[in-house]
Amino acid sequence: MADKADQSSYLIKFISTAPVAATIWLTITAGILIEFNRFFPDLLFHPLP
């Protein structure tokens, strides 16, 4: 059985891979945009003058 140091090393290596990092990044970005649009619905997209 692997010890705690190996398990945390594998977890950090897994989280830092590109697909996982991109998924986390896009989820956070989408959440920020959704919440911004919920509080300020008219400010996200400006119509052309």
Swiss-Prot record:
Tell me the compartments it is located in: Cellular thylakoid membrane
> How does the UniProt record describe the way this protein sits in the membrane?
Single-pass membrane protein
InterPro entries reported in the protein's UniProt record: PSI_PsaJ, PSI_PsaJ_sf
Q: Which sequence ranges are marked TM in the entry? A: 14-34
SUPFAM superfamilies per UniProt: Subunit IX of photosystem I reaction centre, PsaJ (SSF81544)
Keywords attached to this entry: Membrane, Photosynthesis, Photosystem I, Thylakoid, Transmembrane, Transmembrane helix
Taxonomically, the superkingdom here is Bacteria
**Gene Ontology terms: cellular component:** photosystem I; plasma membrane-derived thylakoid membrane
Pfam families in the record: PSI_PsaJ (PF01701)
Query: In its keyword annotation, does this UniProt entry include Thylakoid?
Result: yes
Q: Name one GO biological process term.
A: photosynthesis
Can you tell me which family this protein belongs to?
A: Belongs to the PsaJ family.
Q: What does this protein do?
A: May help in the organization of the PsaE and PsaF subunits.
Assembly behavior? The cyanobacterial PSI reaction center is composed of one copy each of PsaA,B,C,D,E,F,I,J,K,L,M and X, and forms dimeric and tetrameric complexes.
Enumerate the NCBIfam families for this protein.
PRK02733.1
Which protein are we looking at?
A: Photosystem I reaction center subunit IX
Q: Which organism is it from?
A: Nostoc sp. (strain PCC 7120 / SAG 25.82 / UTEX 2576)
**Taxonomic lineage per UniProt?**
Bacteria, Bacillati, Cyanobacteriota, Cyanophyceae, Nostocales
